Amino acid sequence: FMSQLVNPYKYTIYPGFYESCGPEGEKLIEYVEKEWKKQPHVGELPLDIVAQVVEHGDKAVAAIDKAAAAVTRNKEEFGRLQNDMHCYREFAYAFNLKVKAAQRVLNYQWGKDLNELDAAIPLMEQSLDHYRKLVALTDSTYYYANSMQTAQRRIPIGGDGGKNKTWKEM
């Protein structure tokens, strides 16, 4: 959700979450602030990460689609794996574009230039197009997109009451 990118503090993420999940880096909100203040960046950067994820998705799809012609056994299982790679890529594309749109919104918060908000709109529209492709690829095959069916789980969204378990519901 866009609000998780432009205001992550609203979601009361426990303080050690980022430190425990990977190498040092910056949240998008920190990245944009440092850009505006002309401060040096530290560690992994949000725009680099989303670019890498898109690249990995493209490579995964190219490799598995190329391998498809050579599959002679376990074709159904291979088809599921192939679908996984296409899902990964669509999610990567959707998230990449959403991060770029969120960057524009954060730029607006700093500079008050309405052109930043205008520039965010097509990025979000493209992000939604890729998300809809993800939904289509997972509609009959995937459940528990939010990974936990509890009220305590808030990221990406709560799963209490058996809701928000598929990509379509989210």
Descriptions of predicted regions:
Residues 1-166:
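C-terminal non-catalytic alpha-helical accessory regions
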